[in-house]
């Protein structure tokens, strides 16, 4: 293989790896969707989107930011499920917490459960209802009452409905009904607005949701950002905190869902109606990343003693591919592996199948690596055989290079003639590497973003397959912390593999090939340990295959 071709290949691979590490190549924030419009800027509260019919009463502001002190005590109701524990408080019948029982906040065994709703928002709690023409009624903080007991346990696979009601005497009655299904992260909300007066009520309802980044701002990264995402006509649109800070947006239907998510978790809001609503996001605190997302209905009117209902569905939980698929609403689209999704998603299912029998995700990765190696075995075999043929004609190639070193064009002609005579493809040794690059990046995206592997141990010091491997050695190594043992082993096996590969006959090319293990070790040092494990096992299998080919050449 010509030196320039090899250099181009190596540089291309390194550029791709570098770009993915630092710039999130496969999941860049999308531009605003076609159905997104600019909201009119104001010096006080953001103005209501200019989509309200002229004849309708138009509110002059989004719902006010009703805040309570997080340390205040209120009457509350707990909903207990094998998957989660949810609490609803009396003021506004809002969610005060939603913790996932099967997922921890940190890798430590004593770490608290992952909180999808938390009072760390400073008292901004989701599902706060307001009537925009009558915000003085303070529905989002008015006490709601319920006949439900203080604790509801979901069992017997029967959905439970918990209803909460409040009244503004002589004006309006509001009922919020939550429908919870056992062992499901789906939650349904129905809001009923009843006009208690004899006069016509013309209004517009807003339901506010509040989100904080899933990780502290200093730990947020470009390849695992907390961001607002919409699914519109099968296409994902992403908006980071920085995007939302630049301008006021109005998100309009049709959309399948809008969500706040990162690689591992998602808070999805699923409109039940096909139209008659819009979403308005705005940043309340850029330092903390506090986001308010307001669901606005179209203006409506109620005659005396008339009632109107509004429905929403939610998915609050992990981005487990199989779980999202069962939840429908195209929620599985939220698991986005970029350009190589069509490769990565099948790999997730295969990995999950292996895990069901091994109960160890690290072992499942090893088995998956073996399967991939078997699939690529014929191509790799031809590649190694091609390199063996190249090795046999090395003396003739050297003679040609010496004879025509002053005439590069003639030298290349003679070399191509030599390749044809001995039926050797000079690029044959590169084919398996080129074909494995898409699989490599698909695995990288999968292992870096699969919640199934989050905080899952392999063995010994490897306690999180989505995090870099670090062996504590009693002191911190600069920029690393612990010792990346798995990564070093990967580099060593790659070096052994290069030593076993037949020489191309060009000393400069051989030097480049020997530098590759060092470069890969440096790049892999902060990659997920699950990905390093895959590459290490793949190297070991390649060494075994190369040894067999060398013995039978």
Swiss-Prot record:
Xref: Gene3D superfamilies: 2.70.98.90
CDD domains the UniProt entry points to: 5TM_YidC_Alb3, EcYidC-like_peri
Membrane protein topology class: Multi-pass membrane protein
Transmembrane spans: 6-26, 331-351, 360-380, 424-444, 477-497, 512-532
Gene Ontology MF term list: membrane insertase activity
Keyword Chaperone belongs to the record: yes
Record field: compositional bias (Low complexity): 38-59
Domain of life: Bacteria
Broad class of the protein's primary localization: membrane
HAMAP family: YidC_type1
Subunit description: Interacts with the Sec translocase complex via SecD. Specifically interacts with transmembrane segments of nascent integral membrane proteins during membrane integration.
Protein family: Belongs to the OXA1/ALB3/YidC family. Type 1 subfamily.
Protein's name in the database: Membrane protein insertase YidC
Organism: Syntrophobacter fumaroxidans (strain DSM 10017 / MPOB)
Gene name of this polypeptide: yidC
């Amino acid at each position: 293989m010509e030196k320039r071709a090899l250099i181009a290949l190596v540089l291309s691979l390194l550029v791709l790896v570098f770009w993915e590490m630092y710039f999130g190549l496969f999941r860049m924030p999308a531009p605003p969707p076609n159905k997104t419009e600019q909201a009119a800027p104001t010096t006080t509260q953001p103005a209501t989107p200019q989509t309200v019919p002229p004849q309708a009463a138009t509110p002059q502001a989004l719902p006010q930011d009703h805040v309570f002190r997080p340390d205040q005590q209120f009457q509350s109701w707990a909903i207990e499920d094998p998957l989660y524990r949810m609490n609803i408080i009396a003021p506004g019948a809002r969610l005060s917490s939603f913790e996932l029982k099967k997922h921890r906040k940190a890798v430590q065994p004593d770490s608290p459960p992952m909180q999808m709703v938390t009072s760390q928002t400073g008292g901004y709690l989701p599902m706060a209802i307001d009537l925009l023409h009558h915000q003085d009624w303070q529905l989002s903080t008015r006490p709601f009452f319920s006949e439900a007991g203080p604790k509801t346990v979901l069992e017997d696979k029967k959905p439970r409905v918990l209803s909460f009601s409040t009244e503004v005497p002589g004006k309006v009655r509001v009922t919020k009904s939550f429908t919870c299904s056992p062992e499901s992260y789906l939650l349904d909300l129905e809001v009923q607005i009843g006009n208690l007066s004899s006069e016509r009520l013309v209004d517009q309802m807003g339901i506010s949701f509040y989100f904080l980044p899933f990780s502290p701002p200093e730990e947020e990264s470009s390849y695992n950002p907390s961001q607002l995402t919409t699914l519109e006509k099968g296409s994902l649109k992403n908006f980071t905190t920085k995007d939302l800070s630049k301008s006021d947006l109005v998100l309009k239907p049709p959309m399948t869902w809008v969500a706040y998510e990162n690689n591992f978790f998602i808070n999805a809001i699923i409109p039940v109606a096909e139209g008659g609503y819009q979403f308005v996001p705005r940043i309340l605190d850029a330092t903390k990343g506090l986001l308010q997302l307001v669901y606005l209905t179209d203006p409506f009117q109620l005659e005396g003693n008339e009632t109107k209902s509004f429905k929403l569905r939610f998915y609050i939980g992990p981005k487990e591919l199989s779980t999202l698929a069962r939840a429908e609403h195209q929620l599985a689209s939220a698991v986005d592996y970029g350009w190589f999704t069509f490769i990565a998603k099948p790999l997730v299912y295969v990995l999950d199948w292996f895990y069901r029998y091994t109960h160890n995700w690290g072992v499942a990765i090893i088995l998956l690596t073996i399967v991939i190696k078997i699939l690529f075995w014929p191509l790799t075999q031809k590649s190694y055989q091609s390199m063996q043929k190249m090795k046999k004609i090395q003396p003739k190639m050297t003679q040609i290079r010496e004879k025509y070193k002053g005439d590069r064009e003639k030298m290349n002609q003679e070399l191509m003639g030599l390749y044809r005579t001995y039926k050797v493809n000079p690029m044959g040794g590169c084919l398996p590497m080129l074909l494995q690059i898409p699989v490599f990046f698909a695995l990288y995206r999968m292992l870096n973003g699969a919640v199934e592997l989050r905080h899952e141990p392999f063995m010994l010091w490897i306690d999180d397959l989505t995090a870099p491997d670090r062996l504590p050695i009693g002191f911190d190594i600069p920029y690393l912390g612990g010792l990346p043992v798995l990564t070093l082993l990967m580099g060593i096996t790659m070096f052994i593999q290069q030593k076993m590969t037949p020489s191309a006959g060009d000393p400069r090319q051989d030097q480049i090939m020997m530098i590759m293990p060092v470069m890969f070790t440096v790049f892999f040092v902060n990659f997920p340990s699950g990905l390093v494990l895959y590459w290490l096992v793949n190297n070991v299998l390649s060494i075994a295959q190369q040894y067999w080919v060398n013995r039978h050449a």
